[in-house]
Amino acid sequence: MGKIFYEEMPVCFNARELGYANAYDVRKAAYLSVFAGAWGHTYGCGPVIFFGDKGSNFFANLHGWKEGLDFTAANEMKYLRMLIESRPMLDRVPDQGILMNKGSCGAERIQATRGKDYAFIYSAYGRDIAIKANAITGTKLNANWYDPRTGKTTFIGSFDNKQQLIFTAPLPTASPVPSQREDWVLILDNALKNYAMPGDKH
């Protein structure tokens, strides 16, 4: 079970120099840990820990606990569950071996998990994702981008499974500046399986 950042908690208990954990920090920790093999993830929120009003304690410097109940990442955790439950779970394993590029640690990390006929690849900073040939079953693969902020998917296309594939994540919609990237999930499916997208009814 993964539990790393609490949303709006001082990073390393040093808010003056490091600021506060935001929705991206929390989301990144959740996806990286679950895709790497954690059975689940525990979401935490700084202001809710002691149910304090704004300014009443160290964990509620910016907002009170009632506001914390509706924090951004608190609402985004359901999209991770929707994604995981949209495909067969019991044969899913972490597998960095399907990647040509794994990134480094932290913000540069690219983490892959797959079943026999599907794969999820999380790019923590929206870096290009390069996939080896025959990473999963099927002669044709359907590829989609999954937005962990909204739970929405965008169809990329269908591709032959016999060659290396490179996918470039969408640029940020709010601020399309190359240095300001966003995290994304690449969904690859054996086209013959006709899997529904996360949140859709099968």
Language model feature labels by segment:
Residues 1-17:
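Glycoside hydrolase catalytic-domain groove-lining segments
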Residues 13-15, 24-157, 171-202:
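Aromatic- and carboxylate-lined catalytic core of secreted/periplasmic carbohydrate-active enzymes
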Residues 168:
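Residue-level detector of conserved, well-ordered beta-strand and adjacent loop positions
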